[in-house]
C-alpha cells in the first residue's frame, strides 16, 4: 500500500484553501507551512500567464529523510505515509538537507522537525486529509497508488503526469497533472525584487541572481515561502576542527610506524590536538541542535542507517583512542603505542571522511554529492593537521627526520587539496543544481572569498612548504612551514564556508 497525492494544476485556482486548512488542522505556526501554493508568472505584458503549484512532502517510496534521521523520528508507515514523531526529534536539521523538496521545517513551537504527514490522524479514522476536503475544485486527489482500482491510480495511469526532481530517484508519490515545468523546476523561475503581495525573504533575494532561469519564457516566481539555510557557521567550523584532529593523529601514527621519533609532539601534542578536534566537533554539533538537551538520543534511539549516528560513534571512539594514546605514552608502553599507531590510520580516515557519507545522504544538496569529497576531506585533514603540528614543532626539539615528515605530509596534502579543487570545480557536475552552485563559488557571489580567501593563500602556503622541503630541516625552513601551516587554517575555513553555504543556496521548491 502506498498512499499519495495527485495535484491537478489544470483546475487549481491558487486560492490557498489547502494551505489554510492544513495550518488550521495541524496548528502550524505563523510563517511556516506543510503545504503551500507557489505562483510563477511567465511572458511579458500583455502576453502573460500565471501558473500555480501546490508544494508539499512527496511521501517518497525511498525517503532520504528517513535514512538520514539519527533517532528514527521520521519513519515510513505501512500505508506509505512518511510520518514524524516529535518526541524523538533532536532538531539536527539533517532531514531538511536530505529532502529534495523543501518539505521539512523546524516547528517554531516545539523546535522539532515537522512536515505534511498526509493528516495521518485523519487517515487513521477513515477521513481524507484536510486539504483534500477543502479544495473547491477537487484539484487534490488522495488514495492508494498501489491499488489499480482506486480513483487516484486511474487518474495517474490515464493522464500524463510529472513529478518534482525525478533525477533524485526518491520515488516521489505526489503526481502533477498539467503543471508548468517552471513551477516544478526550482531553478527555472528566480524571484524578482518583489512578490505580488510582499517582499521575498532575504535569502531568496540574495540567491535570485545565481539562478539560470528560462530566458525564452521569462518566468519568475511571484509567490513562495521562505526556506533559510539550515546549517551555518557551526557546521563550517566542525569540518575544520575534526580535520585538525584527524590529520594530526594520522601523521603522528605514521611517524611511529616509520620508526621516526616525534618526541613530545607525537606522544602528547598530536593526541591532544586529536582530542581537542573531536571534543570541539562534538560540542559544535550539540550546540547546533534545536533540542540540545536530547543529544543522548543519538545513542539511545539510534538509526544505524544514518551517518550522523555512525559519525557520533566515530567521534566517541576516536576521542577514547586519543586518550589511551596519551596514557600509553606517559606509561611508556611501547607495544600499546605501536598498536594505537596502527589503529590511528583507519580511525583518522574515518574521522576525517565520515562527513562525505553524511553529505552523501543529503539528497537535497547536489553540490555535496561529489564522488571526490571523501578524498578531499582526507587531504584537507592532513593539510591542517600537519600544519598545526608544524606550528607546535617550533616550540619543541624535533629531529630532522621528524621535521622532514611533517613538512612532506603538509606539502603533499596541500597540493592534493588544490588538485582536487581543480578537478571539482573545473570538471562537469552531475546535475544543474551542482553546476549552478559550483559556478556561484568560482564566478558568482562567493568568488572573492573562494579565490582570495582560500585558493591564493593555499597556493602560497604550498609553495612555501615546497621551498622548506627543498631546503631541508633548518631553522629557516621550519619557520617557513610553520607560517604556511598557520595560513592554511583560515584558508580552509574560508573554503568550507562557501562550500557549505553554496550547497544550501540552491532552491528546492
Describe these PLM feature segments.
Residues 1-82, 87-90, 96-98, 102:
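Ferredoxin-type iron-sulfur electron-transfer modules and their immediate structural context
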Residues 41-56, 87-88, 96-98, 102-226:
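Flanking helices and flexible, charged tails adjoining ferredoxin-like Fe-S electron-transfer domains
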Residues 61, 87-91, 108, 127, ...:
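Secondary-structure capping and boundary motifs in well-ordered enzyme cores
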Residues 197-261, 502:
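N-terminal signal-anchor module of multipass membrane proteins
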Residues 230-233, 237-244, 256-262, 303-306, ...:
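Long, contiguous internal "core" modules enriched in hydrophobic/ aromatic residues
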Residues 251-314, 321:
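Membrane helical hairpin/interfacial module
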Residues 289-290, 422-427, 497-508:
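Juxtamembrane/interface segments at transmembrane-helix termini
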Residues 297, 301, 439-443, 503-509:
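Multi-pass alpha-helical membrane architecture of UbiA-family
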Amino acid at each position: 500500500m502506498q498512499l499519495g497525492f495527485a495535484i491537478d494544476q489544470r483546475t487549481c485556482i491558487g486560492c490557498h484553501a489547502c494551505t489554510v486548512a492544513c495550518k488550521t488542522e495541524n496548528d502550524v505556526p505563523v510563517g511556516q507551512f506543510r503545504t503551500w501554493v507557489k505562483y510563477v508568472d511567465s511572458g511579458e505584458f500583455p502576453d502573460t500567464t500565471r501558473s500555480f503549484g501546490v508544494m508539499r512532502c512527496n511521501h517518497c517510496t525511498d525517503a532520504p529523510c528517513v535514512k538520514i534521521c539519527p533517532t528514527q523520528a521520521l519513519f515510513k508507515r505501512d500505508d506509505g505515509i512518511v510520518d514524524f514523531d516529535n518526541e524523538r526529534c533532536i532538531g539536527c536539521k539533517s532531514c531538511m538537507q536530505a529532502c529534495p523538496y523543501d518539505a521539512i521545517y523546524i516547528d517554531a513551537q516545539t523546535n522539532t522537525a515537522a512536515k505534511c504527514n498526509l493528516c495521518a490522524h485523519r487517515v487513521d479514522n477513515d477521513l481524507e486529509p484536510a486539504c483534500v476536503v477543502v479544495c473547491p475544485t477537487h484539484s487534490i486527489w488522495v488514495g492508494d497508488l498501489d491499488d489499480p482500482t482506486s480513483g487516484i491510480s486511474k487518474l495517474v495511469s490515464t493522464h500524463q503526469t510529472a513529478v518534482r526532481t525525478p533525477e533524485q530517484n526518491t520515488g516521489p508519490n505526489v503526481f502533477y497533472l498539467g503543471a508548468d515545468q517552471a513551477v516544478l523546476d526550482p531553478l527555472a523561475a528566480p524571484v524578482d525584487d518583489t512578490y505580488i503581495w510582499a517582499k521575498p525573504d532575504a535569502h531568496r533575494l540574495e540567491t535570485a541572481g545565481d539562478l539560470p532561469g528560462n530566458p525564452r519564457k521569462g518566468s519568475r516566481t511571484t509567490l513562495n515561502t521562505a526556506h533559510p539555510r539550515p546549517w551555518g557557521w557551526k557546521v563550517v567550523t566542525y569540518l575544520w576542527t575534526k580535520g585538525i584532529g584527524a590529520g594530526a593523529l594520522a601523521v603522528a601514527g605514521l611517524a611511529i610506524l616509520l620508526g621516526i621519533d616525534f618526541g613530545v609532539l607525537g606522544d602528547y601534542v598530536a593526541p591532544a590536538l586529536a582530542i581537542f578536534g573531536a571534543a570541539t566537533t562534538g560540542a559544535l554539533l550539540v550546540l547546533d541542535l534545536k533540542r540540545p538537551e536530547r543529544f543522548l538520543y543519538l545513542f539511545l534511539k539510534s538509526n544505524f542507517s544514518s551517518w550522523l549516528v555512525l559519525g557520533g560513534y566515530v567521534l566517541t571512539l576516536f576521542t577514547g583512542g586519543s586518550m589511551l594514546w596519551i596514557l600509553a605514552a606517559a606509561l611508556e608502553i611501547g607495544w600499546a603505542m605501536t598498536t594505537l599507531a596502527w589503529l590511528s590510520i583507519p580511525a583518522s580516515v574515518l574521522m576525517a571522511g565520515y562527513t562525505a557519507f553524511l553529505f552523501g545522504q543529503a539528497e537535497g544538496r547536489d553540490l555535496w554529492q561529489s564522488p571526490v569529497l571523501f578524498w578531499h576531506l582526507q587531504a584537507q585533514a592532513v593539510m591542517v593537521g600537519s600544519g598545526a603540528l608544524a606550528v607546535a614543532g617550533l616550540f619543541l626539539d624535533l629531529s630532522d627526520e621528524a621535521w622532514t615528515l611533517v613538512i612532506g605530509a603538509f606539502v603533499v596534502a596541500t597540493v592534493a587539496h588544490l588538485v582536487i579543487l581543480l578537478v571539482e570545480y573545473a570538471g562537469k557536475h552531475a546535475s544543474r543544481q551542482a553546476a549552478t552552485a559550483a559556478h556561484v563559488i568560482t564566478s558568482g557571489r562567493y568568488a572573492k572569498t573562494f579565490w582570495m580567501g582560500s585558493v591564493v593563500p593555499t597556493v602560497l602556503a604550498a609553495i612555501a612548504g615546497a621551498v622548506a622541503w627543498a631546503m631541508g630541516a633548518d631553522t629557516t625552513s621550519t619557520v617557513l612551514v610553520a607560517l604556511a601551516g598557520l595560513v592554511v587554517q583560515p584558508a580552509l575555513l574560508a573554503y568550507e564556508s562557501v562550500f557549505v553555504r553554496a550547497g544550501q543556496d540552491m532552491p528546492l521548491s
